[in-house]
């Protein structure tokens, strides 16, 4: 799913670049051959969200596939750097609207690609489902932004529906996992992994060996497995799948 989201973001970047270099084909120029300022704003916002979605989804895909470490990656001043990049994108969007410069356009793309990486790397693997849902929302808003540039009503409607539903789902998932929705958007809650269970530290811990689990499974007539936050923290989804396959065979 994360890989598909990356393609949506990349497509938004390509469409925005095509509209910028051949505006006449998209009907977004005035009688003097200049691109409408409103189209430049829509283009810059769409390409920024698309680029963030692309690199963010790639990082999420690599973490979920185990190709890179799922542990949060943080460094000093990370949030200040993210804030600086965000403010820089706003300033560049204003400059791009006034000057319509190719250099500024690709600078927006470059900074957005970097911001997409920085937003996702501090998030732990256990919280990736929320990240994927949020990236789904980003891809929807990227599509909607390009829809405004192309004056495509269908793209605007579908993109808005995907963006809104993804944001709502992310909020619900954050509430269920005792996470801050704002922290998800800002990409800074991965280092807090495990804090959601601190209030339950006084409860009795039930331990068991693999032999105990095997004995219970072998004598059970039916088994219901409910994946939860603990499975995500332990990154046990692959082992759970293997166990389910073996249970079905026997």
Report each predicted region and the residues it spans:
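Generic hydrophobic alpha-helical scaffold/packing signal
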Residues: 132, 145, 158-161, 174, ...
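Acidic, glycine-enriched active-site microenvironments
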Residues: 1-129, 134-137, 155, 160, ...
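Structured cytosolic domains appended to multi-pass membrane proteins
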Residues: 199-250
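Membrane-interfacial segments at transmembrane helix termini in multi-pass membrane proteins
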Residues: 161-220
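Interfacial segments of multi-pass membrane proteins
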Residues: 134-151
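Structured alpha-helical segments in the cores of large, soluble enzyme domains
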Residues: 110, 114-117, 141-145, 209-215
